[in-house]
Every structure is written in structure tokens, then in C-alpha cells.
Amino acid sequence: MGRLQRTRTRRHRRENPIQRLGQMLHRHRPRIRLRQHHTTTHTTHHCRRENHTHKATMTHTIGIVAHTKRAEQAHRLMETVGAAYMSIDNGALGCEANHRKVWQHLTRHNTDWLVVLEDDAIPCDNFRDQLDAALAVAPSPVVSLYLGRERPREYQQRIAKAADTTAHWLTCRRLLHAVGIAIHADLVPHMLNNLPNGKPIDEAISAWARHQSHTIAYTWPSLIDHADETPMIATRNDNQPRTPGRVAWQHGTRDTWTTDTQPI
């Protein structure tokens, strides 16, 4: 009889509605806190992913055109700028064909801009960030990262007149150099299919850009300088020697980049 009473008492205690309510409230407290904590963690993670996505949307991929005589220099440049690809030619391809090869390879990358540097390019400090900031506000889909002295001679006086501008870009109908070029990735396949043959690569890209009504925008100052060394190309189409002094008019960085332009 005593055992029966104790059993009923235990059942009665287990079925006590007040105790059951207390147990339910106790069980639910930590669950509410866990859900709040989980939501915060998820939001932070989502923001991080959005930040990564933002960095990925305004990106560029860099390739380098190099000659075997400058292989060591080219490898240093590749490491400095974080280039994704480099083509080193011993002269069998030639300058123009090697440029085309690098542009063609870069089209495999899913980025907004494709950038080709020559092996004698000298990048500014903090080059990748400066390049991102400049390309984000570029006034043209065809950008030259270098504007040099000495060559071409017929443009030097015009550049000198524009050199005092406060604009962040100098614009011109012609691509004057091939030391550092950035082109919006969407245009590169069409460019490669329509480059005229038999021209130096800067003149070939100029001809294509003019036909497509693209102005060339030069970063001002130049984000790339030119190592004024003995040229790898012995004979030029114009048969004119390359004299010393082929360096950027201005080479440096900006705290911020805008779309302000000044025609050359």
C-alpha cells in the first residue's frame, strides 16, 4: 500500500502543471538566446561575403608581355603586381603576336578589366589598389596607364600644354604607348578579332578603338613608369632611333580618383 501511494505521488508530481510550465519556460530561455546569437553570426558572415563580393565585382586581371633577355626583370614585375599570366618570347613570336597571346589568355578570366604590362613597366606604389580606384571611374573602356616623354614627338607639345591640369585623366583619340594598357573585358574578344595586321600593337589598338569610337583615357599621373633601357626591338616601322628620356610625364598616385578629364 505504501509503494502504491509513493508511485501515485511521483506521477502526481510529474504531472503538476505548475512544474511543467516552469520546465517549459526554463527550456525555452536558452533557445531564444541561441537563436539571437545565431542571427547575429549569420548577419556578420553575410556582410563579410558581401564585402568579398564587392571586391570581386570591381576586379582586374594582369598579364605581362616579356622578352627572354628581361626574364628576371619580368618575374619581379609579375610578383610585384600579382599578375595572373606572363608570356616570355625569345623573338620567335615577335612583340605584336606576344601581346595578342597575352590578351587572348586573359579573356579566360571572369573579371571586369584586363590589363597588359610590358616587362619594362615600373608600377607606382600600392599599384593594385590605385588601379582599382582609377578603373572604377574610368571615363573610357580603353585606358593607358602610361603617358611618356620623347615619343611620339608630334604629341609632346600638346601633352606639355595639358600637363598643368587638375584633371585626373588626359584623353586622346590615339593610344601612344603599349607599356601599360587596361581594356574592359567585354571588348577584348572583339578587339582581338579586329586588330589590323602589320602594325605595332599600340597603333593596331588605336585603329580598332577609333573604329569603335572609343577615346583613350590616360591616368594622370601615370600609374606606370617606363624603365628607360635599350629597346628589345632593333628596327622600328618608323626607322627612328629611341633616344633616352622615355619616361612618364608624371608618375604617382592619388588619394581619390574622379572622372575629371582634359583632352590632349
What is each model feature region?
Residues 11-13:
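Conserved ATP-binding/catalytic motifs of P-loop helicase motor domains
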Residues 15-23:
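Residues flanking N-terminal targeting/processing segments that define the start of mature chains
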Residues 19, 28-45, 49-117, 121-264:
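Peripheral/terminal regions associated with large enzymatic or DNA-binding modules
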